[in-house]
Amino acid sequence: MFEINTSAVGDSLGLTALVAILPLIAFFIMLLGVKARAHTSGAVALAVSLIIAIVGFSMPVDMALSSAVRGGLFGLLPIVWVIITAIWFYEITVASGRFEDLRKTFDLLGDGDIRIQAILIAFCFGGLLEALAGFGAPVAITATMIMALGVKPLRAATVVLIANTAPVAFGAVGIPVTTAGEVAGRSADQTHDIAALISLQVLLIAAIVPFLIAFILDGFRGVKETAPAAAVIGISFALAQWLAATFFAYQLTNVIACIVSLGCAFAFLRVWKPKGVKELRERLELPAAESTTDLNGRRIWMALLPYAVVTVVFAVATAAPAIFGFLKLHFAWPLLDDAIVDADGNLMDTSFSFNVFGNPGTLLLLSGIIVAVVYHFFNENGRYNLSFGQPVSAFGDVVSRMKFSALTIILVLALAYTMNYSGQTIAIGEFVSSAGGIFALFAPVLGWIGTAVTGSDTSANALFGNLQVAAAERISVNPDLMLAANTAGGVVGKMISPQSLAIAATAVNMEGKESVILKNVVGYSVAFLAFVCVIVFLMTNVLGFLVP
């Protein structure tokens, strides 16, 4: 039996917390100081954590190693599995040629106004990509699409980075939320509560992002001339995101929010047209808008089909879990089962569970197969030819491209579980909670820092999720609120992460000028962070009625 001792080093909580935070410091030094690759940084941090667990916290060697393997397996199943299938799902649309029709659909909706087109592409479609792929895909893809509209590189990069905020928390089919709940040992219902709280914390950010996109592209004139459409898109997205995260399946939050906002935009733009479109194109020296006369209802529907399919598949899995939930793996973890007692004297749950057919990754695989079959047989007389071999080849390509990213995720989760099970995270949590209720004001900063450094809200939750819970319990605040705060902080930190900046710079042909892009977006990031901090703090008292 291993008992967690938060004063294991020198019989001092402060000294123990200082030693416990060394793995995180090592991770950030390797990543930012040494400029090592993320998986190398994760490996070094894991090694430091294992040494501290064994030497500093007196955890048996076999239990420490088993903790790391337990975390690594969760990193693989379901996180890496979900990411691989999500990216593969998107690649099917590209291989089929239908993706080009989707791009033209946005041109048709925007009626030649690049400000509205940019909102639809970067915010709505980018949100769909974030829902299915995440991990930089929305930034890379939407940046090139906006550049194709004639927008200058720096503005295009700024637009897509700021647009990639509100959807981040529910990216890759809700993996950041799932990770937050898993590493902190929350139940399925509690994890759903976390999702609902996140949607409230980022509600206003989601609503104002379309206005910011218009401002970046055309200043206050752009905001004035597109305000009605920006309001419809932003408010419909924010409300749909909240409703989906609160009352439906949080894994589909982004898909639903994006489809709803696109639908509202389509309906609204049929009765309202933006002003100053011709003058805008002349003022910004833009080329003539691309013709969309060859588009028809059938082609538009087929371009949108993948997102309808994934919505239906996930809806069925949620409404009738028995259909996909007949094969669930659940077993006690070797060496750890009933063997770890936390700081409060309670046994920690270390069991492993995996729903083979009902997890988001397998559901995405099924959705992709359905889409591939439909695209194969309904190919417009060969115009959109998709052979059965192409999806198979694309899957292999995705696995190959993902190998280092997958290794990073596995190592970061191994680090998180080692820190959690050995007591390192709890020691840090107890120490920071000594700040009292004011800690709630700064809780989102941890998620902001974690995401800014790692480039992933999922990784930030893996690193700091249990710490947030430990701190919340010490100051008698709802742990789910602090987990949500960590995720919401990560949402606004994504735009300044080196990973996101590098992807944006590459997409707009500004390689080596990441610092220029950073200067353009860092102010927005800090302002958003301050707003989230205030909202979270108010939810611990004045707005406490919003917390489940």
Annotate the PLM regions:
Residues 94-99, 111, 146-156, 182-191, ...:
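Juxtamembrane helix-boundary/capping and inter-helix hinge elements in multi-pass membrane proteins
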Residues 114-127, 153-166, 190-210, 408-411, ...:
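Alpha-helical transmembrane segments of multi-pass membrane proteins
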Residues 8-22, 75-79, 132-138, 192-207, ...:
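Structural signature of hydrophobic alpha-helical transmembrane segments
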Residues 6-17, 35-41, 65-77, 192-200, ...:
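Interfacial loop-to-helix junctions that mark the boundaries of transmembrane helices
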Residues 19-29, 36-58, 80-86, 230, ...:
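Hydrophobic mid-bilayer segments of alpha-helices in multi-pass membrane transport proteins
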Residues 169-284, 488-548:
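Juxtamembrane and boundary regions of transmembrane helices in multi-pass small-molecule transporters
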Residues 66-149, 157-158, 382-470:
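Membrane-embedded alpha-helical segments and adjacent helix-loop junctions characteristic
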